[in-house]
Amino acid sequence: MKFLIKSLAVATISILGCLQTALAEEAKTESLTDKAVKHEKLGVKIESANHLFAEKYPLQYDSWKSTAKSTDRGSALEADPRYVILWAGYAFAKDYNKPRGHFYAVTDVRDILRTGAPKDENDGPQPMACWTCKGPDVPRLIEEKGERGYFDPKWAKYGAEIVNSIGCADCHDTTSEEFKQGKPALRVARPHVLRALNTVGWKFEDLDKHGKRPAVCANCHVEYYFKNKTDVTFPWDKGVDVDSIEKYYDEINFTDWTHALSKAPMLKTQHPDFEVWSQGTHGKNGVTCIDCHMPKVKDKDGKVYTDHKIGNPFDQFEATCKTCHEQSKETLEKRVKEYKHEVKEAMIRLEDQLVKAHFEAKAAWEAGATQEEMKEILMAIRHAQWRWDYSAAGHGNHFHAPDVMLRTIATGIDRAADARAKLGVVLAKHGVTTPVAIPDISTKEKAQLAIGLDIPKEQAAKDEFLKTVVPQWEKEARAKGLLPAEEADKPVAAPKAEAK
Protein backbone atom coordinates (compact mmCIF):
# COMPACT_ATOMS: atom_id res chain seq x y z
CA MET A 1 0.00 0.00 0.00
CA LYS A 2 2.81 2.40 0.96
CA PHE A 3 4.48 1.63 -2.36
CA LEU A 4 1.21 2.35 -4.22
CA ILE A 5 0.72 5.67 -2.39
CA LYS A 6 4.31 6.65 -3.08
CA SER A 7 3.92 5.74 -6.76
CA LEU A 8 0.71 7.79 -7.03
CA ALA A 9 2.38 10.74 -5.37
CA VAL A 10 5.33 10.59 -7.75
CA ALA A 11 2.98 10.29 -10.73
CA THR A 12 0.88 13.24 -9.53
CA ILE A 13 3.97 15.40 -9.03
CA SER A 14 5.18 14.44 -12.52
CA ILE A 15 1.83 15.32 -14.08
CA LEU A 16 1.68 18.64 -12.24
CA GLY A 17 5.22 19.36 -13.33
CA CYS A 18 4.34 18.68 -16.95
CA LEU A 19 1.21 20.82 -16.62
CA GLN A 20 3.15 23.72 -15.14
CA THR A 21 5.73 23.44 -17.89
CA ALA A 22 3.01 23.42 -20.54
CA LEU A 23 1.30 26.44 -18.97
CA ALA A 24 4.60 28.27 -18.76
CA GLU A 25 5.30 27.55 -22.42
CA GLU A 26 1.79 28.72 -23.34
CA ALA A 27 2.31 31.92 -21.37
CA LYS A 28 5.51 32.57 -23.32
CA THR A 29 3.73 32.11 -26.65
CA GLU A 30 2.18 35.34 -27.79
CA SER A 31 -0.74 35.26 -30.17
CA LEU A 32 -0.57 37.03 -33.52
CA THR A 33 -2.99 39.60 -32.13
CA ASP A 34 -0.71 40.30 -29.15
CA LYS A 35 2.18 40.92 -31.53
CA ALA A 36 0.05 43.08 -33.82
CA VAL A 37 -1.07 45.26 -30.90
CA LYS A 38 2.62 45.91 -30.13
CA HIS A 39 3.32 46.61 -33.83
CA GLU A 40 5.78 43.73 -33.99
CA LYS A 41 6.26 41.40 -36.94
CA LEU A 42 3.92 38.43 -36.61
CA GLY A 43 6.62 35.84 -37.22
CA VAL A 44 4.53 33.90 -39.74
CA LYS A 45 5.35 32.28 -43.05
CA ILE A 46 3.07 33.18 -45.96
CA GLU A 47 3.00 31.38 -49.29
CA SER A 48 1.18 33.92 -51.44
CA ALA A 49 1.40 32.38 -54.93
CA ASN A 50 -2.14 31.19 -55.66
CA HIS A 51 -1.16 28.86 -58.50
CA LEU A 52 0.85 26.63 -56.15
CA PHE A 53 -2.38 25.29 -54.64
CA ALA A 54 -4.12 24.40 -57.90
CA GLU A 55 -2.96 20.77 -57.96
CA LYS A 56 -3.61 19.84 -54.33
CA TYR A 57 -6.95 21.67 -54.04
CA PRO A 58 -8.37 21.61 -57.59
CA LEU A 59 -12.04 22.00 -56.64
CA GLN A 60 -11.47 25.02 -54.44
CA TYR A 61 -8.93 26.53 -56.83
CA ASP A 62 -11.04 26.11 -59.94
CA SER A 63 -14.13 27.53 -58.24
CA TRP A 64 -12.03 30.51 -57.07
CA LYS A 65 -10.67 30.96 -60.59
CA SER A 66 -14.19 30.91 -62.00
CA THR A 67 -14.69 34.38 -60.52
CA ALA A 68 -12.83 35.40 -63.69
CA LYS A 69 -16.15 34.93 -65.48
CA SER A 70 -17.46 38.17 -63.97
CA THR A 71 -15.95 40.20 -66.79
CA ASP A 72 -18.38 43.14 -66.72
CA ARG A 73 -16.96 46.11 -64.84
CA GLY A 74 -19.47 48.75 -65.81
CA SER A 75 -18.87 52.29 -64.64
CA ALA A 76 -20.82 53.27 -61.54
CA LEU A 77 -20.25 56.89 -62.58
CA GLU A 78 -22.04 56.26 -65.87
CA ALA A 79 -24.90 54.56 -64.04
CA ASP A 80 -25.27 57.51 -61.65
CA PRO A 81 -23.43 60.72 -62.69
CA ARG A 82 -24.35 62.36 -59.36
CA TYR A 83 -21.42 60.44 -57.89
CA VAL A 84 -19.03 62.65 -59.87
CA ILE A 85 -20.36 65.76 -58.13
CA LEU A 86 -20.45 64.15 -54.70
CA TRP A 87 -16.76 63.24 -55.04
CA ALA A 88 -15.59 66.45 -56.75
CA GLY A 89 -11.96 67.05 -55.88
CA TYR A 90 -11.36 63.38 -55.03
CA ALA A 91 -9.98 60.63 -57.27
CA PHE A 92 -13.24 58.66 -57.17
CA ALA A 93 -14.79 61.32 -59.41
CA LYS A 94 -12.41 60.20 -62.17
CA ASP A 95 -13.18 56.50 -62.21
CA TYR A 96 -15.31 54.18 -60.10
CA ASN A 97 -16.49 50.81 -61.38
CA LYS A 98 -19.01 48.28 -60.21
CA PRO A 99 -17.56 45.34 -58.26
CA ARG A 100 -16.56 42.06 -59.89
CA GLY A 101 -14.81 38.82 -58.93
CA HIS A 102 -11.84 38.40 -56.58
CA PHE A 103 -9.81 37.14 -59.55
CA TYR A 104 -9.58 40.71 -60.86
CA ALA A 105 -8.63 42.60 -57.68
CA VAL A 106 -5.04 43.30 -58.76
CA THR A 107 -5.96 43.95 -62.39
CA ASP A 108 -8.68 46.42 -61.48
CA VAL A 109 -6.58 48.49 -59.10
CA ARG A 110 -3.89 48.75 -61.77
CA ASP A 111 -6.42 49.77 -64.42
CA ILE A 112 -8.42 52.32 -62.43
CA LEU A 113 -7.60 55.97 -63.09
CA ARG A 114 -7.46 56.64 -59.35
CA THR A 115 -4.03 55.01 -59.02
CA GLY A 116 -2.55 57.25 -61.69
CA ALA A 117 0.23 56.36 -64.14
CA PRO A 118 3.49 56.21 -62.17
CA LYS A 119 6.67 56.07 -64.24
CA ASP A 120 8.89 54.77 -61.44
CA GLU A 121 8.65 53.51 -57.86
CA ASN A 122 8.61 57.02 -56.37
CA ASP A 123 6.02 58.45 -58.75
CA GLY A 124 2.22 58.54 -58.65
CA PRO A 125 -0.58 59.95 -56.48
CA GLN A 126 -1.28 56.99 -54.18
CA PRO A 127 0.46 55.27 -51.24
CA MET A 128 1.15 51.55 -50.84
CA ALA A 129 -2.01 51.36 -48.74
CA CYS A 130 -4.04 51.18 -51.97
CA TRP A 131 -2.81 47.59 -52.46
CA THR A 132 -3.76 46.45 -48.97
CA CYS A 133 -6.98 44.59 -49.80
CA LYS A 134 -5.86 43.23 -53.14
CA GLY A 135 -4.16 39.92 -52.41
CA PRO A 136 -1.99 37.62 -50.27
CA ASP A 137 1.26 39.25 -51.37
CA VAL A 138 0.29 42.11 -49.04
CA PRO A 139 0.58 40.24 -45.70
CA ARG A 140 3.70 38.54 -47.08
CA LEU A 141 5.30 41.91 -47.77
CA ILE A 142 4.22 43.35 -44.41
CA GLU A 143 5.88 40.38 -42.72
CA GLU A 144 9.05 40.79 -44.79
CA LYS A 145 9.37 44.58 -44.68
CA GLY A 146 7.55 45.43 -41.46
CA GLU A 147 4.58 47.78 -41.36
CA ARG A 148 6.67 50.88 -41.92
CA GLY A 149 8.58 49.25 -44.74
CA TYR A 150 5.30 48.34 -46.40
CA PHE A 151 3.15 51.44 -45.78
CA ASP A 152 5.68 54.26 -46.22
CA PRO A 153 6.50 53.97 -49.98
CA LYS A 154 4.45 55.02 -52.97
CA TRP A 155 1.99 52.59 -54.60
CA ALA A 156 4.35 51.76 -57.46
CA LYS A 157 7.20 50.67 -55.16
CA TYR A 158 6.12 47.02 -54.97
CA GLY A 159 4.12 46.68 -58.17
CA ALA A 160 6.24 43.66 -59.14
CA GLU A 161 5.59 42.04 -55.75
CA ILE A 162 1.81 42.40 -55.42
CA VAL A 163 0.66 40.28 -58.33
CA ASN A 164 -1.54 37.56 -56.82
CA SER A 165 -5.15 38.60 -56.60
CA ILE A 166 -7.28 37.89 -53.51
CA GLY A 167 -6.67 34.21 -52.89
CA CYS A 168 -5.66 31.33 -50.65
CA ALA A 169 -3.27 32.94 -48.16
CA ASP A 170 -5.58 35.90 -47.54
CA CYS A 171 -7.80 33.61 -45.48
CA HIS A 172 -5.82 30.42 -44.81
CA ASP A 173 -2.52 29.54 -43.15
CA THR A 174 -1.31 27.85 -46.32
CA THR A 175 1.97 26.68 -44.78
CA SER A 176 0.41 24.89 -41.79
CA GLU A 177 0.02 21.15 -41.24
CA GLU A 178 -3.68 21.72 -40.71
CA PHE A 179 -4.03 23.20 -44.19
CA LYS A 180 -1.98 20.39 -45.72
CA GLN A 181 -4.48 17.96 -44.19
CA GLY A 182 -7.32 19.69 -46.02
CA LYS A 183 -8.66 21.65 -43.04
CA PRO A 184 -9.56 25.36 -43.29
CA ALA A 185 -6.71 26.70 -41.10
CA LEU A 186 -8.33 30.14 -41.16
CA ARG A 187 -5.93 32.96 -40.34
CA VAL A 188 -5.68 36.74 -40.43
CA ALA A 189 -2.11 37.88 -41.12
CA ARG A 190 -2.64 41.60 -41.64
CA PRO A 191 -1.61 43.25 -38.36
CA HIS A 192 -3.97 46.22 -38.68
CA VAL A 193 -6.91 43.83 -39.10
CA LEU A 194 -5.96 41.87 -35.98
CA ARG A 195 -5.77 45.13 -34.02
CA ALA A 196 -9.16 46.27 -35.27
CA LEU A 197 -10.88 42.97 -34.49
CA ASN A 198 -9.35 43.05 -31.03
CA THR A 199 -10.74 46.57 -30.52
CA VAL A 200 -14.33 45.35 -30.93
CA GLY A 201 -13.83 42.23 -28.80
CA TRP A 202 -13.14 39.86 -31.69
CA LYS A 203 -9.65 38.68 -30.79
CA PHE A 204 -9.10 36.28 -33.67
CA GLU A 205 -7.42 33.50 -31.71
CA ASP A 206 -10.34 33.37 -29.25
CA LEU A 207 -13.03 33.03 -31.91
CA ASP A 208 -14.68 29.73 -32.78
CA LYS A 209 -14.91 28.65 -36.41
CA HIS A 210 -18.17 30.55 -36.88
CA GLY A 211 -16.53 33.77 -35.69
CA LYS A 212 -13.38 33.27 -37.73
CA ARG A 213 -15.33 32.98 -40.98
CA PRO A 214 -16.61 36.58 -41.09
CA ALA A 215 -13.39 37.77 -39.44
CA VAL A 216 -11.31 36.72 -42.45
CA CYS A 217 -13.75 38.55 -44.71
CA ALA A 218 -13.06 41.62 -42.54
CA ASN A 219 -9.56 41.63 -44.04
CA CYS A 220 -11.10 43.72 -46.81
CA HIS A 221 -14.88 44.12 -46.60
CA VAL A 222 -14.74 46.96 -44.09
CA GLU A 223 -14.55 50.72 -43.68
CA TYR A 224 -11.02 52.04 -43.22
CA TYR A 225 -8.99 55.20 -43.60
CA PHE A 226 -5.36 56.10 -44.20
CA LYS A 227 -3.94 57.27 -40.88
CA ASN A 228 -1.10 59.73 -41.46
CA LYS A 229 -2.02 59.45 -45.16
CA THR A 230 -0.35 56.03 -45.44
CA ASP A 231 -1.48 53.50 -42.80
CA VAL A 232 -4.67 51.48 -43.26
CA THR A 233 -6.67 51.84 -40.03
CA PHE A 234 -10.19 50.72 -39.08
CA PRO A 235 -12.20 53.44 -37.25
CA TRP A 236 -13.84 51.06 -34.79
CA ASP A 237 -12.70 52.48 -31.46
CA LYS A 238 -16.22 53.67 -30.60
CA GLY A 239 -18.20 51.03 -32.51
CA VAL A 240 -19.01 50.02 -36.07
CA ASP A 241 -22.34 51.79 -36.65
CA VAL A 242 -22.58 54.96 -38.73
CA ASP A 243 -22.86 57.32 -35.75
CA SER A 244 -19.96 55.81 -33.80
CA ILE A 245 -17.57 55.93 -36.75
CA GLU A 246 -18.64 59.49 -37.57
CA LYS A 247 -17.96 60.52 -33.97
CA TYR A 248 -14.53 58.88 -34.14
CA TYR A 249 -13.60 60.78 -37.30
CA ASP A 250 -14.93 64.07 -35.94
CA GLU A 251 -13.00 63.77 -32.68
CA ILE A 252 -9.67 63.20 -34.45
CA ASN A 253 -10.50 65.89 -37.04
CA PHE A 254 -9.96 63.46 -39.89
CA THR A 255 -10.79 64.50 -43.45
CA ASP A 256 -10.30 62.46 -46.62
CA TRP A 257 -10.44 65.53 -48.83
CA THR A 258 -11.85 69.03 -49.15
CA HIS A 259 -14.76 69.12 -51.57
CA ALA A 260 -13.90 71.04 -54.74
CA LEU A 261 -17.26 72.84 -54.87
CA SER A 262 -18.56 73.28 -51.32
CA LYS A 263 -15.18 73.23 -49.52
CA ALA A 264 -16.72 70.82 -46.99
CA PRO A 265 -14.29 68.56 -45.07
CA MET A 266 -15.38 65.24 -46.56
CA LEU A 267 -15.24 61.57 -45.59
CA LYS A 268 -15.06 58.79 -48.18
CA THR A 269 -16.54 55.53 -47.01
CA GLN A 270 -14.95 52.36 -48.39
CA HIS A 271 -17.06 49.18 -48.21
CA PRO A 272 -18.47 48.65 -44.69
CA ASP A 273 -19.88 45.19 -45.39
CA PHE A 274 -18.72 43.60 -42.13
CA GLU A 275 -20.05 46.54 -40.12
CA VAL A 276 -23.49 46.54 -41.76
CA TRP A 277 -23.78 42.73 -41.72
CA SER A 278 -23.09 42.72 -37.96
CA GLN A 279 -26.04 45.06 -37.40
CA GLY A 280 -28.48 43.09 -39.57
CA THR A 281 -30.66 40.10 -38.79
CA HIS A 282 -28.20 37.59 -40.26
CA GLY A 283 -25.24 38.95 -38.33
CA LYS A 284 -27.19 39.09 -35.08
CA ASN A 285 -28.23 35.46 -35.53
CA GLY A 286 -24.82 34.06 -36.39
CA VAL A 287 -25.40 33.59 -40.12
CA THR A 288 -22.04 34.42 -41.69
CA CYS A 289 -20.69 35.49 -45.07
CA ILE A 290 -19.59 31.90 -45.74
CA ASP A 291 -23.07 30.46 -45.14
CA CYS A 292 -24.55 32.62 -47.89
CA HIS A 293 -21.70 33.24 -50.32
CA MET A 294 -19.48 30.12 -50.05
CA PRO A 295 -21.78 27.12 -49.50
CA LYS A 296 -20.87 23.45 -49.46
CA VAL A 297 -21.45 21.97 -52.92
CA LYS A 298 -20.83 18.69 -54.77
CA ASP A 299 -18.66 18.09 -57.79
CA LYS A 300 -19.71 15.75 -60.61
CA ASP A 301 -18.42 12.75 -58.64
CA GLY A 302 -20.33 13.67 -55.49
CA LYS A 303 -17.37 15.04 -53.54
CA VAL A 304 -18.38 17.82 -51.14
CA TYR A 305 -16.26 20.97 -50.95
CA THR A 306 -16.57 24.68 -50.16
CA ASP A 307 -17.39 26.68 -53.27
CA HIS A 308 -14.93 29.57 -53.64
CA LYS A 309 -16.87 31.26 -56.43
CA ILE A 310 -18.18 33.94 -54.13
CA GLY A 311 -21.47 35.17 -55.53
CA ASN A 312 -25.20 35.75 -55.15
CA PRO A 313 -26.80 33.29 -52.68
CA PHE A 314 -29.80 32.93 -54.99
CA ASP A 315 -27.53 31.29 -57.57
CA GLN A 316 -27.23 28.29 -55.23
CA PHE A 317 -30.51 28.64 -53.37
CA GLU A 318 -30.79 25.04 -52.13
CA ALA A 319 -27.35 25.18 -50.49
CA THR A 320 -27.74 28.67 -49.04
CA CYS A 321 -31.12 30.25 -48.28
CA LYS A 322 -33.03 26.96 -48.21
CA THR A 323 -30.98 25.63 -45.30
CA CYS A 324 -32.83 28.10 -43.03
CA HIS A 325 -35.83 29.50 -44.92
CA GLU A 326 -39.05 27.67 -45.76
CA GLN A 327 -40.16 30.23 -48.33
CA SER A 328 -39.70 29.69 -52.04
CA LYS A 329 -36.85 31.21 -54.00
CA GLU A 330 -39.33 33.44 -55.85
CA THR A 331 -40.78 34.77 -52.59
CA LEU A 332 -37.40 35.62 -51.10
CA GLU A 333 -36.06 37.12 -54.32
CA LYS A 334 -39.11 39.37 -54.52
CA ARG A 335 -38.56 40.52 -50.94
CA VAL A 336 -34.89 41.32 -51.54
CA LYS A 337 -35.76 43.25 -54.72
CA GLU A 338 -38.24 45.29 -52.70
CA TYR A 339 -35.55 46.07 -50.11
CA LYS A 340 -33.18 47.12 -52.87
CA HIS A 341 -35.76 49.36 -54.51
CA GLU A 342 -36.68 51.07 -51.23
CA VAL A 343 -33.06 51.69 -50.25
CA LYS A 344 -32.02 52.86 -53.73
CA GLU A 345 -34.99 55.21 -54.00
CA ALA A 346 -34.18 56.83 -50.65
CA MET A 347 -30.49 56.99 -51.56
CA ILE A 348 -31.20 58.92 -54.78
CA ARG A 349 -33.28 61.44 -52.85
CA LEU A 350 -30.31 62.05 -50.57
CA GLU A 351 -27.95 62.30 -53.56
CA ASP A 352 -30.16 64.97 -55.14
CA GLN A 353 -30.14 67.02 -51.95
CA LEU A 354 -26.37 66.72 -51.63
CA VAL A 355 -25.69 67.74 -55.23
CA LYS A 356 -27.75 70.89 -54.69
CA ALA A 357 -26.07 71.57 -51.34
CA HIS A 358 -22.58 71.40 -52.88
CA PHE A 359 -23.45 73.84 -55.67
CA GLU A 360 -25.31 76.14 -53.28
CA ALA A 361 -22.33 76.20 -50.93
CA LYS A 362 -20.10 77.08 -53.88
CA ALA A 363 -22.44 79.95 -54.73
CA ALA A 364 -22.40 81.11 -51.10
CA TRP A 365 -18.60 81.29 -51.08
CA GLU A 366 -18.62 83.19 -54.37
CA ALA A 367 -21.18 85.63 -52.93
CA GLY A 368 -18.88 86.44 -50.02
CA ALA A 369 -19.88 84.03 -47.24
CA THR A 370 -17.50 83.84 -44.27
CA GLN A 371 -15.91 80.82 -42.60
CA GLU A 372 -18.04 81.41 -39.51
CA GLU A 373 -21.25 81.52 -41.56
CA MET A 374 -20.35 78.30 -43.37
CA LYS A 375 -18.93 76.24 -40.50
CA GLU A 376 -22.14 74.47 -39.40
CA ILE A 377 -23.31 74.13 -42.99
CA LEU A 378 -20.15 72.33 -44.07
CA MET A 379 -20.34 69.92 -41.14
CA ALA A 380 -23.96 69.15 -42.01
CA ILE A 381 -22.91 68.39 -45.60
CA ARG A 382 -20.05 66.22 -44.31
CA HIS A 383 -22.38 64.22 -42.06
CA ALA A 384 -25.11 63.90 -44.68
CA GLN A 385 -22.73 62.57 -47.33
CA TRP A 386 -21.03 60.25 -44.84
CA ARG A 387 -24.42 58.63 -44.28
CA TRP A 388 -25.07 58.37 -48.00
CA ASP A 389 -21.66 56.81 -48.65
CA TYR A 390 -21.96 54.39 -45.71
CA SER A 391 -25.12 53.12 -47.41
CA ALA A 392 -23.89 53.25 -51.01
CA ALA A 393 -20.35 51.88 -50.67
CA GLY A 394 -21.26 48.46 -49.31
CA HIS A 395 -21.95 45.33 -51.31
CA GLY A 396 -25.53 44.21 -50.71
CA ASN A 397 -26.25 46.52 -47.78
CA HIS A 398 -29.92 46.63 -48.80
CA PHE A 399 -30.01 42.90 -48.03
CA HIS A 400 -27.67 42.69 -45.06
CA ALA A 401 -29.53 45.32 -43.01
CA PRO A 402 -32.28 47.18 -44.92
CA ASP A 403 -33.69 48.76 -41.76
CA VAL A 404 -30.26 50.11 -40.80
CA MET A 405 -29.76 51.50 -44.30
CA LEU A 406 -33.13 53.26 -44.42
CA ARG A 407 -32.55 54.80 -41.00
CA THR A 408 -29.05 55.88 -42.00
CA ILE A 409 -30.26 57.49 -45.23
CA ALA A 410 -33.16 59.19 -43.42
CA THR A 411 -30.78 60.88 -40.99
CA GLY A 412 -28.62 61.85 -43.97
CA ILE A 413 -31.61 63.53 -45.63
CA ASP A 414 -32.26 65.41 -42.38
CA ARG A 415 -28.72 66.74 -42.30
CA ALA A 416 -28.75 67.68 -45.98
CA ALA A 417 -32.02 69.55 -45.45
CA ASP A 418 -30.50 71.36 -42.48
CA ALA A 419 -27.50 72.38 -44.59
CA ARG A 420 -29.69 73.66 -47.42
CA ALA A 421 -32.00 75.60 -45.09
CA LYS A 422 -29.01 77.39 -43.56
CA LEU A 423 -27.51 77.95 -47.00
CA GLY A 424 -30.71 79.70 -48.04
CA VAL A 425 -30.26 82.17 -45.19
CA VAL A 426 -26.58 82.79 -45.99
CA LEU A 427 -27.24 83.20 -49.71
CA ALA A 428 -30.05 85.68 -49.08
CA LYS A 429 -27.84 87.62 -46.68
CA HIS A 430 -25.28 88.02 -49.46
CA GLY A 431 -27.82 89.03 -52.09
CA VAL A 432 -28.55 85.69 -53.79
CA THR A 433 -32.34 85.42 -53.76
CA THR A 434 -32.96 83.20 -56.79
CA PRO A 435 -32.37 79.43 -57.00
CA VAL A 436 -28.75 78.45 -57.64
CA ALA A 437 -28.34 77.03 -61.15
CA ILE A 438 -27.20 73.41 -61.37
CA PRO A 439 -25.27 72.54 -64.57
CA ASP A 440 -26.22 69.62 -66.79
CA ILE A 441 -24.81 66.52 -65.10
CA SER A 442 -26.99 63.99 -66.89
CA THR A 443 -23.98 61.92 -68.02
CA LYS A 444 -20.64 61.02 -66.51
CA GLU A 445 -18.83 63.09 -69.14
CA LYS A 446 -20.97 66.18 -68.54
CA ALA A 447 -20.59 65.88 -64.77
CA GLN A 448 -16.81 65.53 -65.05
CA LEU A 449 -16.67 68.53 -67.37
CA ALA A 450 -18.68 70.52 -64.80
CA ILE A 451 -15.96 70.01 -62.20
CA GLY A 452 -13.06 70.53 -64.59
CA LEU A 453 -11.68 67.02 -65.07
CA ASP A 454 -9.58 66.20 -68.15
CA ILE A 455 -10.31 62.48 -68.42
CA PRO A 456 -8.85 61.90 -71.94
CA LYS A 457 -5.47 63.15 -70.69
CA GLU A 458 -5.63 60.89 -67.62
CA GLN A 459 -6.70 57.88 -69.70
CA ALA A 460 -3.85 58.37 -72.18
CA ALA A 461 -1.32 58.36 -69.34
CA LYS A 462 -2.94 55.25 -67.84
CA ASP A 463 -2.86 53.42 -71.17
CA GLU A 464 0.87 54.13 -71.48
CA PHE A 465 1.43 52.86 -67.93
CA LEU A 466 -0.46 49.63 -68.65
CA LYS A 467 1.51 49.13 -71.86
CA THR A 468 4.99 49.78 -70.47
CA VAL A 469 5.16 49.47 -66.68
CA VAL A 470 2.75 46.63 -65.85
CA PRO A 471 4.31 44.08 -68.27
CA GLN A 472 7.66 44.71 -66.60
CA TRP A 473 6.10 44.13 -63.16
CA GLU A 474 4.68 40.81 -64.33
CA LYS A 475 7.95 39.76 -65.94
CA GLU A 476 9.78 40.35 -62.66
CA ALA A 477 7.06 38.52 -60.72
CA ARG A 478 7.34 35.44 -62.95
CA ALA A 479 11.10 35.42 -62.53
CA LYS A 480 10.59 35.33 -58.75
CA GLY A 481 8.03 32.53 -58.95
CA LEU A 482 5.19 34.72 -57.69
CA LEU A 483 3.28 33.98 -60.89
CA PRO A 484 3.36 30.82 -63.03
CA ALA A 485 5.66 30.85 -66.04
CA GLU A 486 2.62 30.86 -68.27
CA GLU A 487 -1.09 30.69 -67.59
CA ALA A 488 -3.59 28.74 -69.63
CA ASP A 489 -7.29 28.90 -68.85
CA LYS A 490 -9.06 25.58 -68.54
CA PRO A 491 -12.81 25.02 -68.52
CA VAL A 492 -14.43 25.11 -65.10
CA ALA A 493 -17.47 22.94 -64.46
CA ALA A 494 -20.32 24.64 -62.61
CA PRO A 495 -20.80 23.02 -59.17
CA LYS A 496 -24.00 21.29 -58.22
CA ALA A 497 -25.60 22.87 -55.16
CA GLU A 498 -26.41 20.65 -52.21
CA ALA A 499 -28.33 21.48 -49.06
CA LYS A 500 -26.28 21.18 -45.89
From Swiss-Prot:
GO molecular function terms attached to this record: calcium ion binding; heme binding; iron ion binding; nitrite reductase (cytochrome, ammonia-forming) activity
Major location category of this protein: periplasm
Enzyme Commission no: 1.7.2.2
Residues annotated as binding heme c 4: 289, 292-293, 400
Cofactor(s) of this protein: Ca(2+); heme c
Chain residue ranges for the region called Disordered: 477-500
Protein residues bound to heme c 2: 168, 171-172, 308
Keywords per UniProt: Calcium, Electron transport, Heme, Iron, Metal-binding, Oxidoreductase, Periplasm, Signal, Transport
Cofactor info, note text: Binds 1 Ca(2+) ion per monomer.
Enzyme class: oxidoreductase
Signal peptide: 1-24
Reactions catalysed, as given in the entry: 6 Fe(III)-[cytochrome c] + NH4(+) + 2 H2O = 6 Fe(II)-[cytochrome c] + nitrite + 8 H(+)
Record-listed substrate binding positions: 224, 271
Positions annotated to bind Ca(2+): 223-224, 268, 270
Annotated localization: Periplasm
Gene Ontology biological process: anaerobic electron transport chain; nitrate assimilation
Pathway recorded for this protein: Nitrogen metabolism; nitrate reduction (assimilation)
GO cellular component, one term: outer membrane-bounded periplasmic space
Classification via Pfam families: Cytochrom_C552
Binding site for heme c 3: 102, 217, 220-221
Function description: Catalyzes the reduction of nitrite to ammonia, consuming six electrons in the process.
Family: Belongs to the cytochrome c-552 family.
Name used for this protein in its record: Cytochrome c-552
Protein source organism: Mannheimia haemolytica (Pasteurella haemolytica)
